[in-house]
Amino acid sequence: MPINKSEKPESCDNVKVVVRCRPLNEREKSMCYKQAVSVDEMRGTITVHKTDSSNEPPKTFTFDTVFGPESKQLDVYNLTARPIIDSVLEGYNGTIFAYGQTGTGKTFTMEGVRAVPELRGIIPNSFAHIFGHIAKAEGDTRFLVRVSYLEIYNEEVRDLLGKDQTQRLEVKERPDVGVYIKDLSAYVVNNADDMDRIMTLGHKNRSVGATNMNEHSSRSHAIFTITIECSEKGIDGNMHVRMGKLHLVDLAGSERQAKTGATGQRLKEATKINLSLSTLGNVISALVDGKSTHVPYRNSKLTRLLQDSLGGNSKTMMCANIGPADYNYDETISTLRYANRAKNIKNKARINEDPKDALLRQFQKEIEELKKKLEEGEEISGSDISGSEEDDDEEGEVGEDGEKRKKRRDQAGKKKVSPDKMIEMQAKIDEERKALETKLDMEEEERNKARAELEKREKDLLKAQQEHQSLLEKLSALEKKVIVGGVDLLAKAEEQEKLLEESNMELEERRKRAEQLRRELEEKEQERLDIEEKYTSLQEEAQGKTKKLKKVWTMLMAAKSEMADLQQEHQREIEGLLENIRQLSRELRLQMLIIDNFIPRDYQEMIENYVHWNEDIGEWQLKCVAYTGNNMRKQTPVPDKKEKDPFEVDLSHVYLAYTEESLRQSLMKLERPRTSKGKARPKTGRRKRSAKPETVIDSLLQ
């Protein structure tokens, strides 16, 4: 639908939060764990029971949408992701991310089983949805779709589609673009199959490991970004470009070392994962708390990349995944509280119209220029070329007229020629070559000149043909990147789009029925309350008051239990942070031990004076390191020296006169800067010195 450039609609929405509970897995069944979570999809509530304490009341949380263990992938997509992707196609930014404890089904929700259409997750279903929308668009609408895939592993940003997946990328920020990744590769795609292949390639490069709670545990946060640019005519008659970005985020799960059994590298990964998720929680708390003046986006790479998604220019949906087993009661409650806070975040999303970093307009401009060049080539008349072809026998002329004729020939050779004209010229050259061979009365010199002229014209013609072919190939490549609306691009994804449409229609009918049942239920409850208010005797009134008192008492006990749980959770968070601090302190002490034993104190102070913290890459950098040490030695030119006499003896290291002063200076050079532990900096050739240099000098001089 055309949009007026002067109007930039902005919508202020809360982050939409949904909760999905997976069924008990085989391990939990074999260990005889009990179901502690009950889901009421109609009311949108999740109730958690503490099975080992019958006196404690259950805790109930309410969300926009909830899904039970029997929920289908298509229903999850249509109810949660479809509205976000529709907004992205209109030009808004959108973010969908899954959060939860490790092993709760986040990756299944986001990716699913791509080989089975009914089990595909949000990411592959979005592919079919996007290209289904493009196929239904009007014919004068142009689209450009590109994708990128990155992971955040141990606080390092890596490109999953790049040649070197271990290379660290820098996080940058510009006022006109916002936060972006420098040198992140992006690929233009033409259909859903291309997207699926790229995602499969990136998924193979992702960091995955096994723990006690999950055999295929994600050890990094992954962000799959789809950028959709759309060009169409506005009300003012001009072409306008809208650009929507869709971030599909699969977060690594929070975990406890006691449950996962993580050690070594897995433990380091878990520490970094928990730190970034803790920062994400702090960001959410700061956004919800109206008194907070600072939001710690920069404390983690994850929160910095999701800066727009949380409280910025984006429509965001968070899917909190929980496990049903009583074994994970604390983690389930923590996740639900986390999600409950997130639904209070307000985002201000606006349509990105005519953005500076849009590629679609640039591609369209290049296509127009190439078409213009090709059209100019076909409009050239044959008279411009024939002038140089008719004067072969006048090639020997010199003077002003000859120079002018030569210039005209050069200019004619540079002009673009149509394909038909090229064929005619080639035929004419062949005829002239045959005629030249048959002329016997020509001198050898004239024959050679004429032959050279023919070869030159043939080369010019071949060059023109190559330029024409190159322009055609470039035009074809650019036109393939720009997708025309209304063209069927679904291919294999057509069946998936049909499944999504059918599921969406069925879901709409179920939603209407559920709404009707909810209204009837509310009416019945209201009738029951009215009946309870009408007491026929004092005894009935006493019973009614007792019931109300019990309800209030239950609510009071639930509030007390909630307070106690919050205190316990706060204590657990503190313990977790303290454990992280202890781990970091151990690493810091190890580094300091290495520094104190191998770098002298004087050099340490010098290094500290010349280092600075780089916020973009999150590490310390040494100033002017390019002008030091081996870097300078490599660049220093070696002065030209005459070849040495092979029989000449090098006496530069020999003392020709042993004076007291020269001996003292040479031995004083042995003293070097010492480390903070009192040890001298080791030389390349180690020598044991039992006495100080002054003692050695005095003994030698006696």
Swiss-Prot record:
Keyword Plastid carried by entry: no
Region (Disordered): 372-424, 667-702
Extent of Basic residues compositional bias: 675-690
Name this protein carries in UniProt: Kinesin-like protein KIF3A
Subcellular location: Cytoplasm, Cytoskeleton; Cell projection, Cilium; Cytoplasm, Cytoskeleton, Microtubule organizing center, Centrosome, Centriole
UniProt-listed GO biological process terms: centriole-centriole cohesion; cilium assembly; microtubule anchoring at centrosome; microtubule-based movement
Keywords noted in UniProt: ATP-binding, Cell projection, Cilium, Cilium biogenesis/degradation, Coiled coil, Cytoplasm, Cytoskeleton, Microtubule, Motor protein, Nucleotide-binding, Phosphoprotein
Gene3D superfamilies in the record: Kinesin motor domain (3.40.850.10)
Annotated coiled-coil segments of the chain: 355-593
Domain (Kinesin motor) ranges: 14-345
Subunit comment: Heterodimer of KIF3A and KIF3B. Interacts with CIMAP3. Interacts with CLN3. Interacts with DCTN1. Interacts with FLCN. Interacts with AP3B1.
Function: Microtubule-based anterograde translocator for membranous organelles. Plus end-directed microtubule sliding activity in vitro. Plays a role in primary cilia formation. Plays a role in centriole cohesion and subdistal appendage organization and function. Regulates the formation of the subdistal appendage via recruitment of DCTN1 to the centriole. Also required for ciliary basal feet formation and microtubule anchoring to mother centriole.
Compositionally biased region (Acidic residues): 376-400
Short name of any one Pfam family annotated for the protein: Kinesin
Modified residues (Phosphoserine): 690
Native source species: Macaca fascicularis
Gene Ontology CC entries for this record: centriole; cilium; cytoplasm; microtubule
Region feature Globular, mapped onto this chain: 600-702
Biased composition (Basic and acidic residues): 410-424
One term of GO molecular function: microtubule motor activity
UniProt: ATP binding residues: 100-107
Keyword ATP-binding recorded: yes
